[in-house]
From Swiss-Prot:
Gene Ontology cellular component annotations, sorted alphabetically: membrane; plasma membrane
Subcellular location: Cell membrane
Transmembrane segments: 1-21, 26-46, 67-87, 95-115, 117-137, 149-169, 179-199, 208-228, 241-261, 270-290
Keyword Cell membrane: yes
Membrane topology: Multi-pass membrane protein
Keywords recorded for this protein, A-Z: Cell membrane, Membrane, Transmembrane, Transmembrane helix
Main location: membrane
Domain EamA: 107-138
Keyword Amino-acid biosynthesis: no
Entry superkingdom: Bacteria
Protein name: Uncharacterized protein HI_1376
Length: 291
């Protein structure tokens, strides 16, 4: 459970950093690009990926995990770009809701792809998790206009993209000792995609964005690392990790927003936190209690 807790803490720290970055004139796109450089560095020196004596390109061509790191390398930066467009055309509240509700896809995958046993406690836990998410994501939307076609496409892209990334990280966890190489290559490809995108936009690079990206990369790397290790620790219970990570981040994020940024927590939001904690309890403890 400690890996999941560390992953949640790092994820919330990433969110806090991104929120502060917008106020410090850090260009998020540039920070994301250099975040991947940091992640590549940590992957290489801390995880020590084993390329089986092959050249980098040969390993990519021959590895059975090629579809995973190719998909991650493309999706990680692409979903960020899609998220920024969704925020632009549909608003941050709707975009955040789409990201959190993407939990539906990995939960579905847990039973259909990863063949997790569907028990009564898991059904109760999943239902409580979605009720909790609904309560936590219900916020005032005054002043928001109707969503146009571009906004709808952006929200669908966010929902689908984040859901698929969660499923892919579970697949990375299943690769066992090969996951360091998979992460290293995924981050490398993601960096290439992001830098190409920024160079095509002909951006003016800023030192504050580079520094912010380095800090972001440290937090993001450990967020992903602990998330994968959580999946490895609970190999037979992916629902716990998928739901625990998602609702854990939004619960802690909501409380952090209130304490640090003086954001208001409504009674419905507090109810959502209670439902969410109950969901984690059911997913982790209820089967053991019944047994």
């Amino acid at each position: 459970m400690h890996n999941l807790i560390f992953a949640i803490l790092c994820s919330v720290a990433v969110s806090v950093l991104l929120k502060i970055a917008r106020k410090k004139n850090i260009i998020i796109e540039q920070a994301i690009a250099f975040n991947y450089i940091t992640a590549i560095t940590f992957s290489y020196f801390l995880l020590k990926p084993d390329f089986k004596g092959l050249e980098f390109t040969d390993y990519i061509a021959q590895s059975e995990n090629s579809p995973i790191f190719l998909a991650l390398g493309l999706l990680l930066p692409s979903v960020f770009i899609i998220m920024s467009k969704a925020v632009e055309f549909a608003g941050i509240v709707r975009s955040d809701a789409a990201q959190r509700l993407s939990l539906f896809l990995p939960i579905l995958a847990a039973f259909l792809i990863f063949h997790e046993t569907l028990s009564q406690s898991k059904i109760i836990g999943v239902v409580l998790a979605f009720i909790g998410l609904f309560c936590l994501l219900t916020k005032p939307t005054q002043g928001q206009s109707a969503v146009n076609f571009k906004g709808v496409l952006g929200l669908i892209g966010v929902w689908f993209g984040y859901g698929i990334i969660d499923i892919l990280f579970k697949q990375v966890a299943k690769s066992g000792g090969a996951f360091p190489a998979t992460l290293f290559i995924s981050f490398s490809l993601a960096a290439c995609v992001m830098f190409i995108y920024l160079f095509l936009k002909r951006v003016q690079w800023t030192s504050s964005s580079v520094i912010g990206g380095i800090v972001l990369g440290v937090l993001n790397f450990f967020n992903i690392l602990f998330y994968i290790k959580a999946h490895q620790s609970f190999a037979g219970n992916p629902t716990l990790v998928f739901a625990g990570m998602n609702i854990g981040v939004i619960c802690l994020g909501t409380i952090t927003g209130a304490l640090v940024f003086k954001e208001r927590i409504s009674k419905l939001n507090w109810l959502g936190i209670i439902f969410s904690l109950s969901a984690i309890f059911c997913l982790y403890y209820l089967d053991k209690i019944i047994a």
